[in-house]
């Protein structure tokens, strides 16, 4: 029964039903949170073995090369840990840096270094340009957009599809506008849509002519191994493809263990051409003599090898896949027949992207808040928090317990239905 096909009387009856459902929802006095994609306590417990590593034996603090990880130095990170993640990311180990906890910090630093000093191929520092723009596939990751926005860089939204961003649009924009210096990308299980970039899209992104010679792909491979199935996405060597296309310096690849081990005490990674690695370390070396190598050694011993990481991710999958399945089940049961919403069914990552009736996302989120269900601000997945259709809501089901996920999604569905009937009645 599509709500849009209902006459006014039937629609009014539905509206009254949803008002009653909403009153019952408020009476429950819930206090639930779907706002951020955080690992649950049970997921964090999977990595408690790190807390007893690297151990206290005579040489427990030395890596396989004999390096004393307690001391200064080693700006590129431990080679053995880099080798594990080079395999997982499909990159040469010599083109990978292992850093401290936050890959977001490496992204931030890369933008700051470009603003202050210019990147390789830059005619001048970005801060000396009258205008700097960044392309933002949307819906996308709000913290990416926040970095560029905070420095006065103009965020330009571009559509994203199931196989990645709309390259037809991107190619036209970058070919003629030298102020466009880069694009934010989440190539595997994109936040929040779950899209995985096709090889064709990746090839076009590294090959396309750009008016800015220093154009950068900010390649945040945050969910490279974060599958919700028993299969992993085959890594694509974006650095190799870019080099073959004559644009070796275009990609800056980022990743971390934040949603693999401890979100607040992991290891970050930056992959790039040899020249870009030297550029980054030259500037990063002014603020640090080296990363936390003891923590890197912990992770090396905890994982052992790339298969150890894959086994860890399957343990994560066992905990969170039922939550994603429950979200899909409830949304279909509550919203499917009414045809007032659509949503993604991701194969990996941390989010479900819900599109409610156009013009009602803010109202839906406000209703949810008043019923004790915290949801990410409507529009947050778009540059400047401006969703042109006011329809997108990001759902983060990993942190709450399974019963809380059930209550939160069921309640959110009630709010979406009520908001839709309000909007449709206003049109009739």
UniProtKB/Swiss-Prot annotation:
**What top-level branch of life does the organism fall under?**
Bacteria
The Swiss-Prot or TrEMBL record lists the needed cofactor(s) as: pyridoxal 5'-phosphate
Which residues are involved in binding substrate?
Answer: 37
Alphabetical list of Gene3D superfamilies matching this protein: Aspartate Aminotransferase, domain 1, Type I PLP-dependent aspartate aminotransferase-like (Major domain)
**The entry's keywords:** Aminotransferase, Isopeptide bond, Pyridoxal phosphate, Transferase, Ubl conjugation
* Record location of the Isoglutamyl lysine isopeptide (Lys-Gln) (interchain with Q-Cter in protein Pup) cross-link: 339
InterPro entries, per database record? AspAT_Ic (IPR024551), PyrdxlP-dep_Trfase (IPR015424), PyrdxlP-dep_Trfase_major (IPR015421), PyrdxlP-dep_Trfase_small (IPR015422)
Q: Provide a Gene Ontology MF annotation, just one.
A: L-aspartate:2-oxoglutarate aminotransferase activity
Source species of the chain: Mycolicibacterium smegmatis (strain ATCC 700084 / mc(2)155) (Mycobacterium smegmatis)
This chain belongs to the protein called Putative aminotransferase MSMEG_6286/MSMEI_6121
Which Pfam families does the record match to this protein? Asp_aminotransf
Alphabetical list of SUPFAM superfamilies matching this protein: PLP-dependent transferases
Membership in a protein family: Belongs to the class-I pyridoxal-phosphate-dependent aminotransferase family.
Binding-site residues, pyridoxal 5'-phosphate: 72, 102-105, 191, 222-225, 256-258
């Amino acid at each position: 029964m599509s709500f849009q096909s209902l006459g006014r009387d039937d629609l009014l009856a539905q509206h009254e039903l949803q008002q009653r459902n909403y009153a019952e929802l408020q009476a429950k006095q819930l206090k639930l949170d779907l706002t951020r994609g955080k690992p649950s306590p049970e997921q964090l417990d999977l990595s408690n073995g790190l807390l007893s590593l690297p151990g206290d034996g005579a040489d427990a603090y030395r890596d396989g090369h004999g390096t004393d990880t307690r001391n200064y130095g080693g700006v590129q990170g431990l080679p053995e840990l880099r080798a594990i993640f080079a395999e997982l990311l499909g990159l040469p180990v010599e083109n990978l840096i292992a850093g401290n906890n936050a890959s977001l910090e490496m992204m931030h630093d890369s933008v700051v270094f470009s603003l202050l000093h210019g990147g390789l191929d830059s005619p001048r520092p970005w801060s000396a340009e009258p205008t700097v723009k960044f392309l933002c596939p949307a819906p996308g990751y709000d913290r990416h957009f926040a970095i560029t926005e905070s420095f006065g860089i103009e965020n330009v939204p571009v559509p994203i599809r199931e196989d990645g961003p709309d390259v037809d649009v991107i190619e036209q924009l970058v070919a003629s506008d030298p102020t466009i210096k880069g694009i934010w990308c989440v190539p595997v299980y994109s936040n929040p849509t779950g899209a995985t970039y096709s090889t064709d899209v990746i090839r076009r992104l590294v090959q396309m002519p750009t008016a800015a010679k220093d154009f950068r792909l900010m390649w945040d491979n945050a969910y490279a191994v974060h599958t919700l199935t028993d299969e992993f996405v085959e890594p694509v060597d974006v650095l190799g493809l870019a080099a073959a296309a004559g644009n070796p310096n275009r990609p800056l690849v980022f990743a971390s263990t934040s949603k693999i081990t401890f979100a607040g005490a992991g290891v970050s990674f930056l992959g790039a051409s040899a020249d870009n690695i030297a550029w980054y370390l030259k500037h990063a070396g002014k603020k640090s003599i080296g990363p936390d190598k003891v923590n890197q050694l912990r992770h090396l011993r905890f994982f052992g090898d790339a298969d150890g990481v894959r086994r860890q991710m399957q343990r994560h999958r066992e905990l969170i896949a039922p939550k994603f399945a429950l979200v899909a089940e409830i949304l279909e049961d509550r919203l499917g027949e009414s045809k007032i919403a659509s949503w993604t069914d991701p194969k990996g990552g941390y989010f479900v992207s819900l599109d409610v009736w156009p013009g009602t996302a803010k109202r839906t989120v406000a209703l949810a808040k008043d019923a004790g269900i915290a949801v990410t601000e409507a529009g947050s997945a778009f540059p400047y928090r401006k969703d042109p259709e006011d329809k997108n809501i990001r759902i983060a089901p990993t942190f709450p317990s399974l019963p809380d996920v059930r209550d939160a999604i069921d309640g959110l569905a009630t709010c979406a239905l009520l908001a839709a009937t309000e909007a449709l009645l206003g049109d009739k």
